[in-house]
Amino acid sequence: MSQIILDEQLGASELVVPLQKWFKVRRLKDILPHQTILDDRIPQILLSLSSPTFLTIDRDFWDRRLCNPGYGILYFAIPDFRQEELAISLKKLLRLRRFRSKVARAGKVIRVSATKIEFWEFQKNRLHRMPWKRPGRQPSE
């Protein structure tokens, strides 16, 4: 079962329960309780886990330098108040052959917006783009 790690700003009530139907879901603060986890520590934490996929809405993670074969990063370009849309969008995204397995996501930093998916891959210099329609209302971006 794929392991999804939720960034700290993601609400547990909006995501953990719906996502647990399909994935093993953990929050960063549950992995390292009683610690403040700054963004620059997150890649090392992810490398200590078994091929996790890190889910975030923090734009700082849309950075090709974070590509590593030990994990994948999914950055959804949505505002904080739209977190309730993430579970359905994530499920739809992970049905795509290109992102279906943890092996397929490993080494990628993926940005999902209302109209497209973009991603960088480990040791590749090309930004990949593909069309996408996020479920639900479409924000103006």
What are these regions (language model features)?
Residues M1-Q3, D7-E8, E14-P18, W22, ...:
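Acidic, PIN/NYN-like endoribonuclease modules and their adjacent C-terminal/linker elements
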Residues M1-S2, L28-I31, L47-P52, Q83-I88:
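Short linear motifs at secondary-structure transitions and domain/linker junctions
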Residues L6-L49:
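N-terminal first-folded block
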Residues L38-I42, S50, I57, L86-S89:
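Amphipathic alpha-helical interface surfaces
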Residues L46-P69:
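Acidic, metal-binding active-site segment of PIN/NYN-like and related structure-specific nucleases
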